[in-house]
Amino acid sequence: MPLLDSFKVDHTKMNAPAVRIAKTMRTPKGDNITVFDLRFCIPNKEILSPKGIHTLEHLFAGFMRDHLNGDSIEIIDISPMGCRTGFYMSLIGTPNEQEVSEAWLASMQDVLGVQDQASIPELNIYQCGSYTEHSLEDAHEIAKNVIARGIGVNKNEDLSLDNSLLK
């Protein structure tokens, strides 16, 4: 089984909240695709609650599109990490970390503006596979934490995992 790029970085050196360009690629038609690691929590020290990350998934995807999509950028997908320390965002285009950071902060402000559970998009039995597993309160706490701490940048060259540690 090939070793995925996300496991070639040293998680003990990651800062959070922080943006990292996890991968870039070019399609055969010439489109640039960028995958971002949006790290909300310090790996192995902090974790997002299951209900909080789920609610954030419903809110964050739309808010990030509102703030980042444009003529040269289109978000393909934003998905929570299985380790519950952040999200991966795949998009067409090549925004820099600062642009992504600004959109992320604005999105966290938008999350705080959601006043009740009924305002969470797609929160129903038909559009959500676990529609009872949500917490707007937890999502608000996550957003407040990101805003209070600010968003940094994790660079791949600073996180390169020594080959002796690869398994």
UniProtKB/Swiss-Prot annotation:
Gene Ontology terms, MF aspect: iron ion binding; S-ribosylhomocysteine lyase activity
Keyword ATP-binding: no
EC number: 4.4.1.21
Intrachain S-S bonds: none
Entry binding sites for Fe cation: H54, H58, C128
Co-factor(s): Fe cation
Cofactor note: Binds 1 Fe cation per subunit.
Protein function: Involved in the synthesis of autoinducer 2 (AI-2) which is secreted by bacteria and is used to communicate both the cell density and the metabolic potential of the environment. The regulation of gene expression in response to changes in cell density is called quorum sensing. Catalyzes the transformation of S-ribosylhomocysteine (RHC) to homocysteine (HC) and 4,5-dihydroxy-2,3-pentadione (DPD).
Annotated HAMAP family: LuxS
Family of the protein in this entry: Belongs to the LuxS family.
Summary of subunit composition and partner proteins: Homodimer.
Name assigned to this protein: S-ribosylhomocysteine lyase
Taxonomic placement: Bacteria, Pseudomonadati, Pseudomonadota, Gammaproteobacteria, Pasteurellales
Gene: luxS
